[in-house]
Amino acid sequence: MKQLFAVLLLVPVLAFAQKQPQGVTYDAQILNVTDGDTVVISAPFLPAPLKPQLAVRVFGVDTPEKGHRAMCPSEAQRGEQASAFTKNAVAKSVKRQVVLYGWDKFGGRVLGDMILDGQSLRAMLIANGFAREYYGEAKQSWCN
């Protein structure tokens, strides 16, 4: 428990300073896929009064936005495709783990990675063209 708090409170600054941050790994029950690079997990390891659910954004990637957050119709379409890819990857996986690195820069989500049957969701998103590497710099447009 103390290890988790150390990670969640102290690592956010370091997470953006390095491309391979150290994290804490847990078996994960994925409750919802929010978009291509964000999932909601069950987090029974968190103490009360924290919510037993945690939004986890995949560290080191940017996927296209979907819906009203997209800057153009092609980005919205690509965002839906990225979300569908993540949902499918989660659905067909048997062993699901999450590696938590620390809070994102806005504090509402935790940065991490999903390990699905031993494969990094981050790596799968990039390899299949649904994400770009992203470490906090200005984002590239998906509308080109």
Model-derived features: positions:
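Small beta-barrel nucleic-acid-binding modules, primarily SNase/OB-fold domains
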Residues: 15-144
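Sec-dependent N-terminal signal peptides
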Residues: 3-13
